[in-house]
Amino acid sequence: LDAARGPLLSWYRENRRDLPWRENRDAYRIWISEIMLQQTRVEAVKPYFARFMEHFPTVQALADCEEEELFKCWEGLGYYSRARNLKKAAEIIVSEYGGALPADHAALLSLPGIGSYTAGAIGSIAFGLPVPAVDGNVMRVLSRVAGSYEDILKQAVKKKMELAVEETLKTLKEGEAGDFNQALIETGAIVCVPNGAPLCGAPCPFYTVCEARKKDLTAEIPVKTPKKKRKIEEKTVLLVECGDKIAIRKRDDTGLLASLYEFPNLEGKLSGKEVLEQMKCRAVIEKELPTAKHIFSHVEWHMSGYLIRVTEEIPGLLFADREELKEKYPIPNAFAAYRKLAAAQTMDSCES
């Protein structure tokens, strides 16, 4: 790393992407962007980041918002625990740090939802702290540069890489830590790419020192332990329509997709007859809906569905019109296909 630090910084300053959260070194903007970028592509994050900053321009605004308002703004990004932790952390920042993120690595690490990578990114980019920010992009780059067959999903391997980066950060001029960390991340994002063959001649700032390139090992490195096979769960989703409204319900306060809204659904892939038997009310199946699939980290939902018309609202369900579905109630991306169908569905008057 020491040998490549000069070329790496020069490469970054010439090739870095123009991203909205890089307009300045504001700690709040950096924090929000880093949380959004977990599990989500840069291009997908851009419009969400702009919308979030419009709704919650300050830590205080985030701390003061209603959770449901936050979830609605987050709708479509998924992994809603990220949003929940953002609000918890904002409340702590307001009460303990006067509404400004602390310029201290240990204090950043103590906040909900902030791990070693995010604390390193905020600390180095916003405050110039010489602390590493090692994510999947960086581990991929460092593994290939070293020609290492160590499993990058092991914590001991990540710790070793963090220590290596930290040693190099100590040799940099004051204020360069943020650019160095971003340069490593950027190399992994646009040259040593996560999917497909690396673009070694992009040019890559590590071209002359990369062991994996020199030994033609880029297809084998990095090494990752295969993930466990996800459990498959089948569900039957119901778009229950009464007049100009569609039924939704709030999920439990704990567990997967906690406190979000969903369309009523039943376990298993059910026939229309089985659905009506379980509903136990006067209902008519209008049509079968397309199938959909949603992948979580540990489970896959395989969904089928029905459009169902009822003559009166069903107790225990909340009936919302299309505008409310769009503007008010946060419905997670797991139901995106059915959310789109519900929004487009032409509603008729309730039958008498």
Language model features with spans:
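Intrinsically disordered, low-complexity, charged terminal extensions of DNA damage-control enzymes
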Residues: 1-17, 23, 186-352
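Catalytic cores of DNA base-excision repair glycosylases
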Residues: 2, 6-7, 11-198, 206-209, ...
